[in-house]
C-alpha cells in the first residue's frame, strides 16, 4: 500500500507544496523562508520518520503567520490524503519528549474530528525572529486539516527554543505511532466502521 500524498496550495499570501511519505525514514527537504520553522519541521519529519518535502513561499515581509499557518493546513491535508480510509492504523498514540529542562507530551486520536488543545506556555515572544505563538497556530491548523484530535502539553520547561522543539518532536513521534499499520487491526479501527 502506497501511503503518499502531494498537496499544493496557492493563495494571495502563500504558495506551498508538501510531499509526504508516511512509511519513509525521516528524509526531509524543508524550505519555508522562516529558518526556525524549517528547523521545527525538520525535527517533526525526522523524529516521525516521515519523508517530508515542504517548499513554501509566503509574505514573510509582513510576518511569518500566513506561511506557518498555511503550511499547517497543507501538511494536515497531506496526512489526511496519505492515510486514505485509515484501515489498519494504530489510530491512538502519545509520546513525551525530554529536551534538557523541558518535557512536552503529545497525544493524538486520528478520529476524523479536527481539533487541537495546546497548553504550551513559552516564556519569550520570539526565538530569533520567530513569533513563538505561531507554534500553536501551526498545531491548530495541522490538526484541523488532518482531521485528528491533538493534545500538546508542556509538563516542564524554561527555554523557549527547547519547549517548541520538544513539542514538534513529540507531535512527530506521536503521529508516527498513530499512523503505523498494526497487522492485528482488521479494517477501520472504530466501532462505527469509519473515521
Predicted features and spans:
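N-terminal intrinsically disordered, cationic/polar leader segments
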Residues: 1-195
Amino acid at each position: 500500500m502506497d501511503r503518499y500524498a502531494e498537496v499544493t496550495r496557492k493563495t494571495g499570501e502563500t504558495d506551498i507544496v508538501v510531499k509526504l511519505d508516511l512509511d519513509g525514514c525521516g528524509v526531509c527537504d524543508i524550505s519555508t523562508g522562516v529558518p526556525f520553522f524549517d528547523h521545527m519541521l525538520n525535527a517533526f519529519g525526522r523524529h516521525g520518520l516521515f519523508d517530508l518535502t515542504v517548499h513554501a513561499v509566503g509574505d514573510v515581509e509582513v510576518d511569518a503567520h500566513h506561511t506557518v499557518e498555511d503550511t499547517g493546513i497543507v501538511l494536515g491535508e497531506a496526512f489526511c490524503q496519505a492515510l486514505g480510509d485509515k484501515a489498519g492504523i494504530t489510530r491512538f498514540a502519545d509520546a513525551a519528549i525530554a529536551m534538557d529542562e523541558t518535557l512536552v507530551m503529545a497525544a493524538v486520536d486520528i478520529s476524523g474530528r479536527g481539533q487541537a488543545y495546546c497548553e504550551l506556555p513559552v516564556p519569550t515572544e520570539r526565538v530569533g525572529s520567530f513569533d513563538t505563538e505561531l507554534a500553536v497556530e501551526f498545531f491548530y491548523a495541522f490538526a484541523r486539516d488532518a482531521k485528528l484530535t491533538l493534545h500538546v502539553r508542556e509538563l516542564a520547561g524554561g527555554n523557549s527554543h527547547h519547549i517548541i522543539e520538544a513539542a514538534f518532536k513529540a507531535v512527530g513521534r506521536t503521529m508516527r505511532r498513530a499512523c503505523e499499520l498494526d497487522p492485528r487491526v482488521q479494517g477501520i479501527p472504530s466501532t462505527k466502521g469509519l473515521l
